[in-house]
Amino acid sequence: MANLTEKSFVRGRLIPILGALIVFIISFSVLYMGENVGLSDNGDFRRVLIMNNIEYKDDTNHYYLFNENYKMLLDNSDSFSGAIVSSWQTNDEEEIYKSPHFMFIKLSKTLNVIANKISGNALSDYNIMYLAILYIFMLSVAAGVIFTFFNESSVKIQITIFLLFIFIFCDAGYLLYFNSFYGEPLQYTALMMLIAFGMLIYKRPSVPKAIGFFTALYFFAGSKLANIPYSLIVALLSVIIVFMRKDRLYRVGIIITAGLCVINIISLYTEIPEWMNRDTTYQAVFLGITKNSKTVEKDLEELGVSKEYAPLAGTHAYMEKDEYPIDITTEEFEKGFYEKVKKTDIAFFYLKHPIRLVGELCHAIENSAYIRPPVVGNSETVPMEFTKKFSGWSKIRVSLRFLYEPWVIFVSFILITLYMIFMNVFYIHNHKIESPARKYMVCALDILILGLWINLVMPIVCNGEADLAKHMFLFTNCVDILFAIGITALVVCPIKRTLAIMCAGALFTGLFYIDLPRKTVTLGRLNGEPLEWEKIRTLEDGTELLVTKECVGFMPYDDESNAWEISDVREWLNTDFLSEFSVADRELIVMTKNRNLLAFNQRERAEGGNHAHYWNFTKSLVYDMGDTAYYNYTEDMVFMPNLMSVKDISVEEDFWVMSPYTANDYMARYMNDDGFILHTDVRNEKGVRAMIRIKR
């Protein structure tokens, strides 16, 4: 009997606790072992820092480097007790917005004050590590609860759950958010706590567990205010918890807890600041509905807006004032646009134009490939550098292209949704004979499937294509959860069926890597070896566009500028690179007039265009609106792929793209080895793929 009790303790308590401890250690190590890593500021930190009385320690550029150290603005930084009290103060002079997220930031401030007192540092010093520790602790607790839920399952299932949690949900793509002031880390950890409490309720329902569940739901809703509609649906569907037990006291407790949760979530909605609603509405219309529309004026009239605002199509809410073709700060625009267009109008517009909605959703799905936001950096020292620490799942999910292939996602979601509709009809029809636990399980799956659809549609309807990759984080998270459920179900299957499904999955994945052989040409020499080129296409004048099959060198783009016309890489390609070409080879090369995009700071050199090119990292959208962006021309014998030609080029390793990152004048675009087009400092080394145009 004693041995049985000891085994029960080990499986029921000790192993889950050890699992949670491993999650904590791994998470902390990913962020702080070796170089400290996190996420740089994309501009969103400002409002969080202001509201919580925190500021940067210096005036250096923080947009592309992860920053660990800040300064707290404390009313009484000389007194320990006064500093503790001041750490919980909110900036009442700046009513930017309110969020439950601030509670965690204030708690991290208190931890910093205590640590500073112990270490002898200035009480006002702020290290974001303490905020990360809070998130790591929440993730570890959620992991421990999830491991506990499976403590009575087979060893095979327990090992599978543990490995999936470590490999997928402790991936750097998720953990990097912990070292930032974004709302996503609270969203992520609150979602994991929500799942954990949901599992506890499934096993042994009680009011305290329900309180934990609905508290996690409240923080999930408040972490990103766009989560509020989904959170309300979750709260209403979670009424199924009431029927898990029959005693009246339990049911009353659940109803009261759920009611308080709904009231608090609704209060979050009522406190959404008007500026946030205005900006997102602007972007949903002008960087969403009308962005690539061929009927802009008709679209605006359908929304109840004057067609005079048609020139604003393709603009966003955070441009310089002189970049707008129409002044959007006037009272006339306030009445003519902001007072007329609501989010419901945008939703109904898409319902009446489902083909256009599907098109936008396809772009959204493609933007869900990365877990970490591809527009911000991870390093403290190298601008726009991505860490490779513990990024196995990030790498694999990009390689598994079906996870962000639009038609695969749509077909899968539709089939799963139809199956869940069938299951709901079945359980409703047989509600008298089915157990509450099984109904609860079906309801939990309903919540997940609804989350997939809602979090696919919400970013487009509520904010257009603005910052789309980052706004797809919750959708990506839900897809990963569904994938983990699928892998777990696969492990449960009989071995023969498991092997058959794995073989079919491998074959299906392989279909995405089928690439027809390209015609190759041998021309010129480099380092004494003949150069092999791939034919891209034949142009209208009969000349052929070629690109080197492999990188011909690895070097910085330039030592300071992202302008192609004055770059070091352009000079090298048109001098040293050609030095081993024979006269006959050179005579085959045709001088090419290239249209080059320009950074915003270089617009005075533009020969055309009326805006800086907007950033995107997918092949389908990377050149979007490039035809109207600032540009000039150069003539080159040898050049590099640009944003228009990258979609036709094979990818084996990173290589520079002949286009700047237009938000500044010291970063350039490059093709990552996974087929996405990113950006980095021009002083970093990347591969070079030469392009030429030759006579046939």
Annotate each PLM feature.
Residues S108-V141, A364-G392, T575-Y614:
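Extracellular-facing segments of soluble proteins and assemblies that are Gly/Ser/Thr-biased and enriched
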Residues A2-E35, H101-T290, R401-I495:
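Hydrophobic transmembrane helix bundles of membrane-integrated enzymes that assemble
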Residues G377-V398, Y404-S412, Y440:
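Small-residue-rich helix-loop
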Residues I514-R696:
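Collagenous Gly-X-Y triple-helix signature in extracellular proteins
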Residues L49-E93, P273-P383:
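Membrane-proximal stem/loop segments at transmembrane-domain junctions that anchor or position
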Residues C362-S379, I487-R497, V552-M555:
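Short linear, low-complexity motifs centered on an aromatic residue
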Residues G12-S77, L260-E271, T509-G510:
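Transmembrane signal-anchor helices characteristic of membrane glycosylation enzymes that use polyprenol
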Residues M502-G510:
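Sec-dependent N-terminal signal peptides of Gram-positive bacterial secreted proteins and lipoproteins
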